Amino acid sequence: MKMERLERTAVEAQLTELSGWALNDAGSSISKTFKFANFVEAFGFMTQAALAAEKLNHHPEWFNVYSRVDVTLNTHDAGGLTELDFKLAKAMEKAAARGVV
């Protein structure tokens, strides 16, 4: 299924539902830094997020150092942001809710 790139107004509307996510200057990706109490919590979050990503067949760009996980989402095939990015962001929020400091 081909996902259509969202218009800037739709992206901004979706962002109002997500705390702490930022739109990059080009409007082509969203990002957030998640902070946890320790590496085990960070890795647990990444595991849950990976399962959600696999279910959606949509995978994040992320970077982990100890208790911090930096996430960037976009849809390469669409050249910007799609509904999939926001579905994955919401799934990540649920995964993080149990351990974010």
Curated annotation (Swiss-Prot):
Keywords: Lyase. GO terms for biological process: tetrahydrobiopterin biosynthetic process. The keyword Cytoplasm does not apply. Its EC number is 4.2.1.96. The keyword Lyase applies. One of its GO terms (molecular function) is 4-alpha-hydroxytetrahydrobiopterin dehydratase activity. It is an enzyme of class 4 (lyase). Gene3D superfamilies: Transcriptional coactivator/pterin dehydratase. It catalyses: (4aS,6R)-4a-hydroxy-L-erythro-5,6,7,8-tetrahydrobiopterin = (6R)-L-erythro-6,7-dihydrobiopterin + H2O. Transmembrane segments: none annotated. NCBIfam families: PRK00823.1-2, PRK00823.1-3. Belongs to the pterin-4-alpha-carbinolamine dehydratase family. This is Putative pterin-4-alpha-carbinolamine dehydratase. It comes from Rhizobium johnstonii (strain DSM 114642 / LMG 32736 / 3841).
